[in-house]
Design a protein with these regions (language model features):
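An alpha-helical appendage that flanks or caps ligand/catalytic pockets
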Residues: 1-29, 68-186, 219-221
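Glycine-rich, proline-tolerant flexible connector loops at the mouths of alpha/beta enzymes
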Residues: 64-65, 192-203
Length: 221
């Protein structure tokens, strides 16, 4: 991260002799328009990186965790930001979580029940790194895709979650988003609507429904 930040801010080419990376010449051209930096968001769960983001006045990104575990991370971040002499705003905290939105809670739950009763499809995303999967194969340990989005702020992976963070009709999904906003200080959300067994027309219908029924509620937060 130090290398990236210097590359974005240093006006002249420079050499880098770090612990992990050595480069004879580093230069970014054209220069970033934003000064001193474009918005930088650090996606992390580890305490040392959370503190790094806070001390360097960088944004924080959290992905796919339940609200309780997300709050544990954002509470640390905001406390360390205060220690560093600044207060992060909502735009500094980003959350990424999967969504399935339907006209009613009943329809959303019906889809989810059908998903839980089937085996994971081939398009479930691989959120762990390939190297971890290879290492698991080498030592004969289990590598279960179904649990990759469950975990704790310390980064361990437990459970059998299918990773749908926002599920329900418009009012339910709006209230779920509001809980992340109120408890975690999150002001930016990134939600992949494409889920297992959801085709493109259904995704477009979800997005239209979200814009028509959920966004007006979010604007009132």
């Amino acid at each position: 991260m130090d290398l990236i930040l210097k590359a974005l801010t240093e006006p002249q080419p420079f050499s880098w002799e770090g612990r992990y990376y050595q480069f004879r010449t580093v230069a970014v051209w054209p220069r970033p328009v934003q000064q001193p930096l474009p918005p930088v968001v650090v996606g992390t769960r580890s305490d040392d990186t959370i503190r790094y983001a806070a001390e360097h006045r960088l944004g924080l990104g959290v992905s796919f965790l339940p609200v309780d575990q997300t709050q544990a991370i954002t509470d640390k971040y905001r406390a360390w930001c205060e220690e560093a002499g600044w207060t992060p705003g909502p735009d500094n905290i980003v959350y990424r979580g999967s969504i399935y939105l339907a006209e009613t809670d009943e329809l959303a739950n019906e889809w989810f029940e059908g998903l839980t009763q089937s085996r994971p499809g081939p398009n479930i995303p691989l959120r762990r790194t390939i190297s971890e999967a290879i290492q698991s194969a080498r030592v004969g340990s289990t590598f279960d895709l179904r649990g990759v989005v469950a975990g704790s702020p310390e980064g361990d992976v437990v459970g059998n979650s299918l990773g749908i963070n926002f599920l329900g009709g418009p009012d339910t999904v709006a209230s779920q988003i509001k809980e992340f906003h109120d408890r975690c200080g999150i002001g930016v959300i990134d939600m992949p609507f494409q889920q297992n067994k959801v085709d493109h027309p259904a995704v477009m219908k979800e997005i239209e429904l979200f814009g028509r029924t959920v966004i007006p509620q979010i604007k009132e937060f």
